[in-house]
Curated annotation (Swiss-Prot):
Tissue: Expressed in the esophagus, stomach, jejunum, ileum, ileocecum, ascending colon, transverse colon, descending colon and rectum. Expressed in myocardial cells of the heart, renal tubular cells, hypothalamus, and pituitary.
Intrachain disulfide bonds: 110-115
Biological process, per Gene Ontology: adenylate cyclase-activating G protein-coupled receptor signaling pathway; adrenomedullin receptor signaling pathway; angiogenesis; feeding behavior; negative regulation of blood pressure; positive regulation of angiogenesis; positive regulation of gene expression; positive regulation of heart rate
Subcellular location, record wording: Secreted
Gene source species: Homo sapiens (Human)
Superkingdom of the source species: Eukaryota
Keyword tags: Amidation, Cleavage on pair of basic residues, Disulfide bond, Hormone, Secreted, Signal
Protein name: Protein ADM2
Site description Required for CALCRL receptor interaction, residues in chain: 107, 114, 119
Signal peptide range: 1-24
Function summary: Intermedin/ADM2 is a peptide hormone that plays a role as physiological regulator of gastrointestinal and cardiovascular bioactivities mediated by the CALCRL-RAMPs receptor complexes. Activates the cAMP-dependent pathway through interaction with CALCRL-RAMP3 receptor complex.
């Protein structure tokens, strides 16, 4: 359910990138059409670090506009530090290990269904030994529960 707002924000940002003048007009900006910018010429001697800091993307402007409409006191704006330093609880921390918000399974090895069946079968064989099926009933080929 949390992916729907993320997908909606992504669609809106793509739409704003396709229509560069629509965001400034909707926010009360200049009604003139915006000229598309030309990419800067690259030379082999230019360094990897940009000379000027990169401008904030259109998504940032959209986010700021939406935050202003909702009310500035309701949620912190992206990129600004939290007022309380990011701590939610003032008491001591009981567990010193890394905190996980949800229970996470540690994936080791192959995650294909056939590999999992193979691993479970091998573990059963290890637990029961090679004489594992001697105590069970023989397979009846005419039974609907058998594979025969």
């Amino acid at each position: 359910m949390a992916r729907i707002p993320t997908a909606a924000l992504g669609c809106i940002s793509l739409l704003c990138l396709q229509l560069p003048g629509s965001l400034s007009r909707s926010l009360g900006g200049d009604p003139r059409p915006v000229k598309p910018r030309e990419p800067p010429a690259r030379s082999p001697s230019s360094s990897l670090q940009p000379r000027h800091p990169a401008p904030r993307p259109v998504v940032w402007k959209l986010h700021r506009a939406l935050q202003a409409q909702r009310g500035a006191g309701l949620a912190p704006v992206m990129g600004q530090p939290l007022r309380d330093g990011g701590r939610q609880h003032s008491g001591p921390r009981r567990h010193s290990g890394p905190r996980r918000t949800q229970a996470q399974l540690l994936r080791v090895g192959c995650v294909l269904g056939t590999c999992q069946v193979q691993n479970l079968s091998h573990r059963l064989w290890q637990l029961m030994g090679p004489a594992g099926r001697q105590d069970s009933a023989p397979v009846d080929p005419s039974s609907p529960h058998s594979y025969g």
